[in-house]
Every structure is written in structure tokens, then in C-alpha cells.
């Protein structure tokens, strides 16, 4: 592999968060019964005419502005012709020669280096349906709920040189669409997905090698592993004197391999031509200026501000700014209690643990910034220990209770009365003479044993600092 350079480009599809589809009024809501959100337009019935969703145009333009694209004042829809069971019209409505956005870029960080990745174009298109293959039955079903859902396809230049760079680019792109509010970024549900074009060339060569397109990449991990495997596969072929075939390959996440799916089509295979049922999109200067003026703070700018204003590490800032609701939650909590690093630690630790375990999102949880800020405050004030705070976090997350009232009702307030703790320390020392002798003989690591025994006697409520202080003085 040392003699080859990988050349990678990504085609990213982001489903737009519009209430209705791109060319009809059917709902875009995920999870409905099969074929519940289907009308004559998205089913491709003869004689029906599409009506463009204006909000989808706005969302596409906002994305273009966010990544430094030229937003074309005029763009045209084209028919992309191919046959597949989940494409009832026999063609996809996309854009070809005149897309809505062109010539942008996105800066990514890999290690200590910053690299600029070119964005060739962003275009609007409608999504296809979904084929469902029933196990054990010699039959496939077609669900057209997704047919006609608005997408933007974001096509990168072939500027990526490793799987790591590809994942960094994809994460940065996802953070932008989420912050803009134009896509929920859910890779598992397919609302944010990508295809990767991978080829190899001898190091120092200018010409590109033959590329393979990788599909079925529905997580960052799959993107990383599929590209790494494909690079290795192509390198082995070239080393053996074989040729790489231009084809579309499917990633098998169980076997961690890519398998041939079909020959890779060229643009002429789709016989693009302007859609006669749709007039060109015209965007005037006033509307474009309005969209530019109302663009929210973008993830990279927010990340840099979190580092400079709140003293967060690059890694912590990156995680907190990956999701818009997390970033806003963090800032709201810091406004209530000005301890940004402690707030960040609570969010990246216990809060993220609960979200992961319950498979939910912050937006629909009962936890509020006021509660998290108060929890950090009462730990700092010594009202409860950090351990108690961690132990009760799950209940606070579930019921949305305010921490101070909750711990007082449960009798969990930390014991900071020196005499009460001293009594527990004396009892532990008296009950464990062998351990005391061993400790005084040099086995100082036994202090954790004594601390644990004291905490057990006080049901975890003793102030840990006082426990350690008293043990140190009494054990000598």
C-alpha cells in the first residue's frame, strides 16, 4: 500500500426536514405503515404534475451558503432515467447540468492538520422508495413512503486521501446540516447517508485510477471500515498485476468486506434531460440575502468559541457541537452556573451514558439545563458527593426532577459533620485490626478499603474529603 495513494470522493445524501415531499403534499414522517404516505404523484401515475416544495429550495440554498458555494440564481431539474422496482416513475427527478449550488469547500481537522475539501456541487432530487426482502419467502415488497422525499446530494471533489479523512469530512458535514435544522442526521434511519468512490494510483501520479463506488454505508464506522477494506482490496489486485473493475460494490458489515453489486454506470447511461413538467428555479437577490443573514452560527465557529470562551479541549468541544441541541443545552446550563468544564464533564459522562443506554435523544428527554446546572452546583457546594450525583442521575434524567429537592426528599444529603464521620472511622478501624496493622506496615493502598468501609457505614453520604482526612490522621 505504501506505493499507492488513495483517491476518495463522497456523495452524501441528506433528507430535508420538510413536512411534505418534494413534489406533492404527502407527509415525510418516518415510521408509518408501508405505503401510507403515497399519492398519485409519488406513485408515478400517468397525467399527474409535480408542484415544487419551496422550503426544500431554501434548505438546499442554505446548505450551499454554509459551505461557501455559489448559489445559482437559475437551476434546472432533470430526469435521471433508470429502472428499479422502488422507482415507480421510471426516472428520478434530479439536477444535472444546472444544479442549485456549485464550487464550495469544507475544512476538516485530522490530527493537528487542517485540510480543505472541495465541494463540486449540491443538487436537489427526490428520494426513491424502499425494497423489503422477506426472509424465507420468495418475494420482495416495495414501500413507497420514502418516494418523493426531498434530498440534497452533496458531491465532494476527490480530495480525500484516507478513510480517516472521509469520516472527518462526513462528521463535519453532518454537524452542519443538523445545526442548520435542514436534516436530522439520522444515519440508521437513512436520512443521512453516503456513497464513497474509491480508487488508487501510484504515488506521485496525476491520473486517477479506476474507481469503485461503495454503498450501504449507514454509520461512520461502516464508512471507515468499508473504505479501508476497499483500499486494501484494490492494492492487492494491483500488486498481483490485475485490473480494478469499475463497479458498484456493497459493504457487508458482518464479514467486513465489499462485494460486487453491478457495473458502475456513467452519466450517459442515465440519459439525463430537462424535466418538461418543471420550470427552472429562479432565486432573486433579496431572498438570497435574507437566507444569508439568518444563517445560524455554524459548528466550526461554535467549536472554536467553546474552546476560547469556555476553556474546553478540542475533543470535548467537537462532541458538544456535533449536535445542535447538545450545544444549546450546554450554553443554557453554563448561563445558570458558570462552571463550563464541570458542566461539559457532566454532559459527556452521565448524560451521554443515559442517552446511549436508553437509545433516546436529548430533545425528547425530561432532563433540562436547569437541572443539570443545579446538580453540578450542589456537588460543588458539598450538599452531595459526586458519587451520589452519578448514582441518582438516571432517576433525574427519567423524571425531570430538580436535584436539590430530590436528594433532600431521599435523605441523600452528604454528611459533613466531623463528629459523625469520626465515629464511623473509629468503628471501621476497631473492626479491622489486621488491615490496620498491614497499612501501618507499609501497605498504604489499603486506604481505599477503609474509605469504602466508612462510606458503607454512612450509606455513601459521608464527605469523602473529610473521610480521607480523618483516616490519615488516625491511621498515622
From Swiss-Prot:
Q: Which GO terms describe its molecular function?
A: asparaginyl-tRNA synthase (glutamine-hydrolyzing) activity; ATP binding; glutaminyl-tRNA synthase (glutamine-hydrolyzing) activity
* Catalytic activities: L-glutamyl-tRNA(Gln) + L-glutamine + ATP + H2O = L-glutaminyl-tRNA(Gln) + L-glutamate + ADP + phosphate + H(+); L-aspartyl-tRNA(Asn) + L-glutamine + ATP + H2O = L-asparaginyl-tRNA(Asn) + L-glutamate + ADP + phosphate + 2 H(+)
Check the record and name the SMART domains matching this protein.
Answer: GatB_Yqey
Its domain of life reads Bacteria
UniProt similarity note: Belongs to the GatB/GatE family. GatB subfamily.
Q: What HAMAP family does the entry give?
A: GatB
**What is annotated about its quaternary structure and interactions?**
Heterotrimer of A, B and C subunits.
* Protein name per the record: Aspartyl/glutamyl-tRNA(Asn/Gln) amidotransferase subunit B
UniProt organism field = Nitratidesulfovibrio vulgaris (strain ATCC 29579 / DSM 644 / CCUG 34227 / NCIMB 8303 / VKM B-1760 / Hildenborough) (Desulfovibrio vulgaris)
Amino acid at each position: 500500500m505504501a506505493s499507492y495513494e488513495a483517491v476518495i470522493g463522497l456523495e452524501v445524501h441528506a433528507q430535508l426536514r420538510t413536512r411534505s415531499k418534494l413534489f406533492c403534499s404527502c407527509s415525510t414522517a418516518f415510521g408509518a405503515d408501508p405505503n401510507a404516505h403515497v399519492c398519485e404523484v409519488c406513485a408515478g401515475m400517468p397525467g399527474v404534475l409535480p408542484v415544487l416544495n419551496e422550503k426544500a429550495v431554501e434548505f438546499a440554498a442554505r446548505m450551499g451558503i454554509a459551505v461557501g458555494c455559489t448559489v445559482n440564481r437559475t437551476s434546472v431539474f432533470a430526469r435521471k432515467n433508470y429502472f428499479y422496482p422502488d422507482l415507480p416513475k421510471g426516472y428520478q427527478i434530479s439536477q444535472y447540468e444546472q444544479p442549485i449550488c456549485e464550487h464550495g469547500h469544507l475544512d476538516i481537522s485530522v490530527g493537528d492538520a487542517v485540510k480543505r475539501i472541495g465541494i463540486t456541487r449540491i443538487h436537489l432530487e427526490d428520494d426513491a422508495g424502499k425494497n423489503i426482502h422477506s426472509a424465507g419467502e420468495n418475494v420482495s415488497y416495495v414501500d413507497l413512503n420514502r418516494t418523493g422525499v426531498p434530498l440534497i446530494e452533496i458531491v465532494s471533489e476527490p480530495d480525500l486521501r484516507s478513510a480517516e479523512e472521509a469520516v472527518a469530512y462526513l462528521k463535519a458535514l453532518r454537524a452542519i446540516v443538523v445545526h442548520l435544522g435542514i436534516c436530522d442526521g439520522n444515519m440508521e434511519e437513512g436520512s443521512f447517508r453516503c456513497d464513497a468512490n474509491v480508487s488508487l494510483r501510484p504515488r506521485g501520479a496525476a491520473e486517477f485510477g479506476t474507481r469503485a463506488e461503495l454503498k450501504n454505508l449507514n454509520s461512520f464506522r461502516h464508512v471507515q471500515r468499508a473504505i479501508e477494506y476497499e483500499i486494501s482490496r484494490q492494492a492487492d489486485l494491483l500488486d498481483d498485476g490485475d485490473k480494478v473493475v469499475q463497479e458498484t460494490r456493497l459493504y457487508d458489515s458482518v464479514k467486513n468486506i465489499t462485494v460486487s453489486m453491478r457495473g458502475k454506470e456513467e452519466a450517459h447511461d442515465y440519459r439525463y434531460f430537462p424535466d418538461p413538467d418543471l420550470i427552472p428555479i429562479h432565486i432573486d437577490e433579496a431572498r438570497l440575502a435574507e437566507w444569508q443573514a439568518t444563517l445560524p452560527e455554524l459548528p466550526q465557529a461554535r467549536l472554536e468559541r467553546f474552546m476560547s470562551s469556555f476553556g474546553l479541549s478540542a475533543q470535548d468541544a467537537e462532541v458538544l457541537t456535533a449536535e445542535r441541541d447538545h450545544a444549546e443545552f450546554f450554553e443554557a446550563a453554563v448561563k445558570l452556573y458558570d462552571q463550563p468544564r464541570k458542566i461539559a464533564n457532566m454532559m459527556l459522562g452521565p448524560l451521554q451514558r443515559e442517552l446511549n443506554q436508553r437509545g433516546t435523544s436529548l430533545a425528547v428527554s425530561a432532563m433540562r439545563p436547569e437541572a443539570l446546572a443545579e446538580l453540578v452546583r450542589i456537588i460543588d457546594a458539598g450538599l452531595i458527593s459526586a458519587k451520589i450525583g452519578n448514582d441518582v442521575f438516571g432517576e433525574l434524567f427519567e423524571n425531570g426532577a430538580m436535584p436539590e429537592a430530590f436528594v433532600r426528599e431521599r435523605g441523600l444529603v452528604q454528611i459533613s459533620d466531623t463528629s459523625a464521620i469520626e465515629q464511623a472511622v473509629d468503628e471501621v478501624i476497631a473492626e479491622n485490626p489486621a488491615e490496620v496493622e498491614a497499612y501501618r506496615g507499609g501497605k498504604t493502598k489499603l486506604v481505599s478499603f477503609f474509605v469504602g468501609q466508612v462510606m458503607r457505614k454512612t450509606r455513601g453520604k459521608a464527605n469523602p474529603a473529610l473521610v480521607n482526612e480523618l483516616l490519615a490522621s488516625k491511621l498515622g
